[in-house]
Amino acid sequence: EALAYLDEVTGTGPGGALLAGLDNVREPHLHAFLDAKAAQARERRVVLRLGDQTWIQGVLTEPVVVTTVLGNLVDNGIDAASGPDGGQPGEVEVEVIADGDTVLVTVGDSGPGIAFEDADDVFAEGVTTKPGAHVPGGRGMGLALARQIARRVGGDVWVADAGGRGSADDDEPGGAVFVARLPGVLAPTDEAEDDSYSQTDEPGVTP
C-alpha cells in the first residue's frame, strides 16, 4: 500500500497519470493551472478529475480572476475531500466550459457536504466547509473571496448542491457542488468559434 501511494503521489502510478481530459483544456493558463492543482491534490491523497463536458479554448482576458476563483473552489474541494492517512483517497471533480466569452466552472467533492442549514452561509468571511464552521486566524476566506471576485466581473459563485445527504444504497455521503459563472473573461479564437458551430451542426460529435 505504501508503494502504491508513493506511485500515486509522484505521478508514476495509475493514480498519478496525466490528468485525464486535460487535452480538452486548450487555454494555456488553465491547462497549466489544472495540471498543477492535480499534483497538489495527489499530495493530499485526493484525486482530481475533469468532468466529461470540460471543453475550453481561446485566451483568458482575465487570467487572475479565473484562476483565483477556480483555485479557491478547488482548494475548498480538496480540503473537504482529504481524509486521514491510510483512508480511501478523496475525489474532486472539476468541469470547465466555455460559453462565448463566459467561463462556467463546476467543482464537486467527495467530502461530507455543507452542514449549515442555509448553504449560502458558507460564503461568509471566516467560515469553512470543514468541521468547526468558524475558523480563527483569518482562514475560511477562500469561498468568500471567490464570490467577491466573480461578482466584481458581473458573475457569481453559488452552491448547486449542499451534499451531505447520501442515499439509502450509498454509505458515502455526497459532497458539495459549487458553480461559478465568469462572464467576459475569455477571448474565443476563430478555431473555437468554428468548433462550436460544427458541434451544433453535428449533434453527438464531441471534440
Task: For each feature predicted by the language model, list its residue ranges.
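Short beta-to-alpha transition helix within the HATPase_c
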Residues: 4-8, 21-44
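Conserved short strand/loop->alpha-helix "switch" segment adjacent to the catalytic nucleotide/phosphoryl-transfer site
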Residues: 47-69
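Short beta-strand/loop element within the Bergerat-fold HATPase_c
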Residues: 89-101
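Acidic ATP/Mg2+-coordinating residue in the GHKL
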Residues: 109
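Short conserved segment of the HATPase_c
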Residues: 114-126
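Short alpha-helical Gxxx[C/S/T] motif in the catalytic ATP-binding
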Residues: 142, 146
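Glycine-rich ATP-binding loops of the HATPase_c
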Residues: 153-171
